[in-house]
Amino acid sequence: MDAQIEKAIEIAWDPRSDQNLKEQAVQYLTQVRGDSSSLQACLNLFTRDPKAAEVVRLVSLDIVNNAIQTQHIDDQSLRGLKEQLHDYVRRTYASGNEVDPPALQNKLTQTLTFLFSSLYKEGWESFIRDFLSFTGHQNGTVDNLPGVVLYLRLLSSIHDEIADLMIVRAGGETKRNVELKDLVRARDVQIVAGSFQHILTYWQGNNDAIVEMTLKVIGKWVSWIDISLVVNQDILNLLFPLVGRNPNGGEDKVKDAAIDCFTEIVAKKMKPSDKIGMILFLNLGEVVSQLIASPALHDLRNTSSYDTDLAEAVAKLVNNVVSDLVKILEDTKVEPEVRAQAEQSLQTFLPLLLRFFSDEYDEICATVIPSLTELNTFLRKAQPLPPAYSAMLTPILNAIIQKMRYDDTSSYADEDELTDEAEFQELRKRLQVLQKTIAAVDEALYVDVLSNVIGNTFQRLDQQNGQIDWRDLDLALHEMYLFGELTLVNGGLYAKSQPSSIAAERLIVMMSKMVESGIASFNHPAISLQYMEICVRYCSFFENQTQYIPQVLEQFVGFVHHNHSRVRIRSWYLFHRFVKHLRGQVGNVAETIIQSISDLLPLKAEVPKESDDDMSSEDGSHDAADVAFNAQLNLYEAIGCISSTTSTPIEKQAIYARTIMNPLFSDVQRHLEQAKSGNAQAVLQIHHIIFALGSLAHGFSDWSPGEGKRAGQAPAKEITIEFSRAAEAILFALEALKSSSEIRNAARSSFSRLMGVMGVAMLPLLPRWIDGLLTQSSSKEEIGMFLRLLDQVVFGFKKDIHEVLNSLLTPLFQRVFASLSEPVTGTDDGIQLAELRREYLSFVTVILNNELGSVLVSEQNQAFFDPLVQSVTTLAKTVTNETGNLAASKIAFSVMTKMAELWGGPTIATPGQPITSSVQPQPTFPGFDTFLIERFHPVCWEVLREPHFRPMVDAQSKSVLNELAGLEHVIYMKTGNMFVEHLQGNFFPSMGVDGSGFIKSMVESPERKGLATFLQNWLKGRA
């Protein structure tokens, strides 16, 4: 069998093997892996002499490994494996013979670790001592290198297997590991700790790799053994020289490992008094101070030889110490003496923490952010702050602010540094959180420090005639941007034309200085962007200080022409935001602005190349074109805002609109014939033009019909006339190119924006919009989005839309029903179908809720009423688990309830009160009472009898049940005794169901909730 397994492994791992033969070999090895009788053969292949090929030995031992780990081996065989492997290790690792390659050593370590887990409790109690004995050629020595390496590998692997808290384990495995750790502590921990000392003593200065391995093992084991076994003078006398060695720099893994070892020692959980005692005993403050002062971390700090690994290791140690000190101080039960010691230690460690926090390397800074966050949180809670704590705030805040600054070596927005830039902005966000915490602790200090930083920078800019490092100015502007958040919390900059707070007062001064300082002309893209962002964020300043608006507008005109693409593109959006906020204050400047930026308005569509994947080319050029176009739309909207200010006469507004739109109309005519013949560039050009027209309209008026508070802002007639031309141009293009999804999407977007400038003038055009937007090729998603737009139109123009809605309803529903009936072709299509169902039902709901229900039953739409009801009832009773079914069912039941309320006639039965049998239903339409009982009511019980419908355990189903109960309630209220008699004499008997409980609950429950509760309990009983 040994030979068969060996041959199979050789074939399976030989790339030259025949594929069929290789498959047979793999299949055979799979059988071997599951056959416990083959384990001895596999072990023989690993241990035999002469040795088999490395791959044969590796695979064979892996099969043994798998059997031990999965417990597919009996105790007798397990002990046999133990004896054979123990003998192999003695022959190979204790005798000085040639040892196994690294990969086999790893696999052997893994196998022995599994044997430890299985046999250390009973069967191999001497495991650790046995392998320790292999570390020396004579008793008491540890001079056998192969044996020492294997011993340390095993100790490390045992920790990983039974004590690593980062690994999630099953309950039984956790219990086993606890028992094993207890056994190790009782039997061998003293021996293990002693071996650490012996190995370090013998190999220090002889083999750094062994010393590094030993330190890493100590760092692991210290978390679960008695700390005194490691923190004692003998061990420390060996550790401290390692921490302090090689002070002149250069990579030193042993030194880093020694520091990491201290870090793990500090991280060990213990009582506050013991923890502070250990920190003081180890004299860690002095140790860290000496490390920081060493040439490796001090003299070489700003050079390429700076030891970042060492810095990160020491920073991690400092982070752990400070975190522990904060936890001690947070503990209200700590003794006064311990608290005093912790406070003193914190004073010692804060400068050390800030040293690494302010490190030029962000990775090192990030290492100590967790403990600094904990410290700031502690200070925020420790109100009122004692003087010793208050004194900490200023150095912390100064360090945070300084860390916000770009490094001297950084180059803003270079292509090669975009990743670094993104990482720095992420760091700034983390620093902002820390800064906010300081503001929460002492707002007055925060205001003073930031005011000084910003004010001093502006002063230097003035004194040095603009000759200042852009990084300093960027820092001041960034802090100014953040500083204003204090004013936003307090309700804005002004209260009754006066500064709302001290922070607001300071920001107002900063804003004035910023605008007056000439920063806008500072030649650096980061400064230009920061300046614009601040102007937009604190627009309320300009609402009160209007004298600055012309100057800033002129500056924006410069920014929108900036030679740096990032600044230029971003400025188009920010310019729009600025004028939109201040349209009431900018005055009659439209003509000047239009002339100044007219060169930026021409649209130029760029079609992606055929080689582009997913509409984006490798060099990102198409993405850039998309970004530029979307930003360009902001210019059109900005012109709309400026052109429609209250200080601009209506006649002038119309002229400005015409001036912008006429070139766009000509452009449509110029490209339409090419677009109709399939020219992609022409289609995209018209797509861009349609979007631009919509953006201009939105700038003129973002008024939405139905906004009661803004009813007076309905569009002026002159403006409506101008934009009616835009609507005609868009419809003209849409009707010619409605097969293009790009054109439909652009038209749909512009449709919603034209509503604001056209008002009721849009209504007669609705049939043409529907014909163009809802075509044979329109997706379910497109139809759903358009129905959502129609919801707004119906709601906004409910007094004017009746006739138009009446005429377009049947063709609209025909398009919707055709799409609803299409087969689902995939997951995305299923999601779109669910969304379309919801939008369709919501549209019907809007019609019913806005007193327009008569259009559903008008003479013109009467033929479509039955298909409408059929579709609603079908969706109501579809409650299976497919995407969106329950959401649609809920809306469908609410639609049926609304129909019952509208057309069921007056209420003739009040739940909770006696039935008056003499009162007959009086529906709005003859026979609608019977319709409710025979068409709507059975739908409720189809749902209730659906096995998948489980409102007891599903929240969405419960919502459906609530709507269902509401429908039954309304049917009863409209039909009274007629409904009860139908239930008693016909419906329930035909179902073979005792409906007396249902009838009683329906009649006696004053609200639908009572009936819903009854039905839920009834369903529970059925289950």
Swiss-Prot record:
Disulfide bonds: none annotated. It comes from the Eukaryota. InterPro entries: ARM-like (IPR011989), ARM-type_fold (IPR016024), Exportin-1/Importin-b-like (IPR013598), Exportin-T_C (IPR045546), XPOT (IPR040017). The keyword RNA-binding applies. Its main location: nucleus. One of its GO terms (biological process) is tRNA processing. Pfam families: Exportin-T, Xpo1. Keywords: Cytoplasm, Nucleus, RNA-binding, Transport, tRNA processing, tRNA-binding. Belongs to the exportin family. This is Exportin-T. The gene is los1.
